[in-house]
Amino acid sequence: MAFPKMRLMYVCLLVLGALCLYFSMYSLNLFKEQSFVYKKDGNFLKLPDTDCRQTPPFLVLLVTSSHKQLAERMAIRQTWGKERTVKGKQLKTFFLLGTTSSAAETKEVDQESQRHGDIIQKDFLDGYYNLTLKTMMGIEWVHRFCPQAAFVMKTDSDMFINVDYLTELLLKKNRTTRFFTGFLKLNEFPIRQPFSKWFVSKSEYPWDRYPPFCSGTGYVFSGDVASQVYNVSESVPYIKLEDVFVGLCLERLNIRLEELHSQPTFFPGGLRFSVCRFRRIVACHFIKPRTLLDYWQALEN
């Protein structure tokens, strides 16, 4: 009696294993063939008042922002985002915005854009899960309107960026093509807990590990990478985590991530302030507008 039961159990396990393999392969194929990819529409609601052909910038800083973050944008305009020349190289900063359902906020941003001429906007609703759309909008703008930029940095509104030190390191690096750096994430796994801010379902991304990518709080790349990422973006399955999506594009392009310096320079988790320390970092997260102004004044003095 024991032998037939064992044989039946063995057959059941084989069938179960075959079914698991089938559904696993099916989900992978579905992921590869799914139609939900980034679509290029080319329609901008707002474009900045700048001509990169006339004055090619060394570094373009693209800052993701929202309508409610006026204080953050104003603080950045007064500090690291102010148009300037560092070591003879021109730097320019632009803010990436979607749309809002608030008529009052829309009007305020219209006026802000006319006043400062530094806002890039398309017709998608602002929100955390549209950051991929927002980032790709900035990359598309560089591809179409500012391919002359030597380097591009994508960062967020709650960041301190040491543009002087970043420029110094980029000049020392002397890399002008296929260069990508930031806070490297080389062994990250999808979060499957539904209540997490970074939750990604199996249907969105069936694999158990992400490709190498850089923290979305701040990464830097050579100008040619913008066009390469933009051109390949429609062939890469869309994922709402913008830094992972860019990592998927880089994997498709076979562009490897590099360290900017032998010492840590990107701090997505924040860092205690000191003048000496902040003179030798590139990026620090969780900086409020008033704090940014205070830090900048301390560094200038």
UniProtKB/Swiss-Prot annotation:
Catalyzes the transfer of Gal to GlcNAc-based acceptors with a preference for the core3 O-linked glycan GlcNAc(beta1,3)GalNAc structure. Can use glycolipid LC3Cer as an efficient acceptor. Its EC number is 2.4.1.-. GO terms for biological process: lipid metabolic process; protein O-linked glycosylation. It is a single-pass type II membrane protein. InterPro entries: Glyco_trans_31. It comes from the Eukaryota. Residues 29-301 are lumenal. Pathway: Protein modification; protein glycosylation. One of its GO terms (cellular component) is endoplasmic reticulum. Belongs to the glycosyltransferase 31 family. One of its GO terms (molecular function) is N-acetyl-beta-D-glucosaminide beta-(1,3)-galactosyltransferase activity. Its main location: Golgi. Coiled coil: none annotated. It comes from Pan paniscus (Pygmy chimpanzee). Glycans are attached at N130, N174, N231. PANTHER family: BETA-1,3-GALACTOSYLTRANSFERASE 5, BETA-1,3-N-ACETYLGLUCOSAMINYLTRANSFERASE. The chain crosses the membrane at residues 8-28. It is found in: Golgi apparatus membrane. This is Beta-1,3-galactosyltransferase 5. It catalyses: a globoside Gb4Cer (d18:1(4E)) + UDP-alpha-D-galactose = a globoside GalGb4Cer (d18:1(4E)) + UDP + H(+). Keywords: Glycoprotein, Glycosyltransferase, Golgi apparatus, Lipid metabolism, Membrane, Signal-anchor, Transferase, Transmembrane, Transmembrane helix. Residues 1-7 are cytoplasmic.
